[in-house]
């Protein structure tokens, strides 16, 4: 049963992951978002207490 021989498949597996780990991370990290988040002010918004009229 040749499919149980790990010799060729293990090297293919290792080379594939080596290629993925050397090519893909720079491409993913070079991605820029079109809308950069703007920093919010440190002031907290004024909230008025809201009393529910229980009738």
From Swiss-Prot:
It is found in: Mitochondrion membrane. Belongs to the ATPase protein 8 family. It comes from Gadus morhua (Atlantic cod). Subunit 8, of the mitochondrial membrane ATP synthase complex (F(1)F(0) ATP synthase or Complex V) that produces ATP from ADP in the presence of a proton gradient across the membrane which is generated by electron transport complexes of the respiratory chain. ATP synthase complex consist of a soluble F(1) head domain - the catalytic core - and a membrane F(1) domain - the membrane proton channel. These two domains are linked by a central stalk rotating inside the F(1) region and a stationary peripheral stalk. This is ATP synthase F(0) complex subunit 8. Pfam families: ATP-synt_8 (PF00895). The gene is mt-atp8. GO terms for cellular component: mitochondrial membrane; proton-transporting ATP synthase complex. GO terms for biological process: proton motive force-driven ATP synthesis. The lineage of its organism: Eukaryota, Metazoa, Chordata, Craniata, Vertebrata. It is a single-pass membrane protein. The chain crosses the membrane at residues 4-24.
């Amino acid at each position: 049963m040749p499919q149980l021989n790990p010799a060729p498949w293990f090297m293919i597996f290792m080379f594939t992951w080596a290629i993925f780990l050397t090519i893909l991370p720079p491409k993913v990290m070079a991605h820029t978002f079109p809308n950069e988040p703007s920093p919010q002010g440190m002031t907290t918004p004024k909230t008025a207490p809201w009393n529910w009229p229980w009738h």
